[in-house]
């Protein structure tokens, strides 16, 4: 049998293009017609889409998860941070952290308004998925720090230094269908979590929804 993983909204922005790749569209349409194939979805919105097109035949709902041991038990208390990150720690202000893609679905305006309070150091790890970060002008905020990506094997050491971990996404068709892996990694770190009002984040009592 064919197993089709349906883990994101079919949106060209996720592919970094203006149009959805033809092969992606064709695989989706073929799967929606062939009810013998197994479809695995990770979010309620994706499940509703499948149900509307082919019913519940061979449909599996499986939200994302986490390597709990890696994020909870493999934090190195003697990890040597580079100077740039160490200097942020030395400022002594509460640190708000995010890691992941910086893309069109990221709420830059919200982060900018948070930075303008002057109460926090905001640390962003990840990749610039498109030109949205430059257009947002966050680099002009002295307390916003984009530090690039970090290897998965040491990422937990940086995240563990944050006072709050966040997922500040805009609410749109992409994020309505997102079950963020980082959400479960944040949980394993046992840190306060604040997100925007995403359906898949609302499911968990440990997540605070910002408005």
Where are the regions that the model predicts?
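Carbohydrate-associated surface elements
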Residues: 45, 62-65, 74, 162
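Acidic anion/phosphate-binding donor-loop and adjacent secondary structure
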Residues: 14-17, 66-87, 104
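Nucleotide-sugar-dependent
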Residues: 153-158, 165-187, 194-206
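Membrane-proximal helix-turn-helix segments that form the acceptor-binding/catalytic region
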Residues: 4, 10, 19-39
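Nucleotide-activated donor-binding/catalytic signature segment of Leloir-type glycosyltransferases, i.e.
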Residues: 93, 126, 132-159, 208-209
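Short hydrophobic "strand-cap" motifs at the C-terminus of beta-strands
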Residues: 42, 96-100, 125-126, 147, ...
């Amino acid at each position: 049998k064919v197993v089709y993983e349906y883990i994101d909204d079919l949106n060209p922005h996720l592919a970094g293009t203006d149009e959805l790749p033809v092969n992606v569209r064709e695989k989706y349409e073929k799967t929606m017609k062939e009810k013998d194939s197994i479809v695995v979805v990770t979010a309620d919105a994706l499940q509703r889409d499948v149900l509307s097109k082919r019913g519940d035949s061979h449909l599996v709902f499986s939200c994302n998860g986490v390597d709990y041991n890696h994020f909870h038990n493999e934090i190195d208390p003697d990890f040597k941070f580079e100077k740039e990150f160490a200097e942020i720690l030395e400022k002594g202000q509460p640190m708000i952290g995010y890691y992941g893609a910086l893309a069109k679905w990221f709420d830059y305006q919200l982060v900018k308004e948070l930075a303008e309070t002057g109460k926090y150091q905001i640390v962003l790890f990840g990749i610039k998925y498109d030109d949205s970060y430059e257009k947002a002008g966050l680099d002009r905020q002295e307390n916003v720090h984009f530090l690039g990506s970090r290897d998965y094997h040491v990422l937990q050491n940086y995240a563990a230094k944050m006072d709050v971990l966040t997922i500040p996404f805009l609410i749109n068709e992409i994020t309505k269908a997102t079950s963020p892996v980082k959400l479960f990694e944040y949980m394993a770190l046992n840190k306060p979590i604040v997100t925007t009002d995403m359906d898949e984040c609302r499911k968990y009592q440990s997540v605070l929804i910002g408005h």
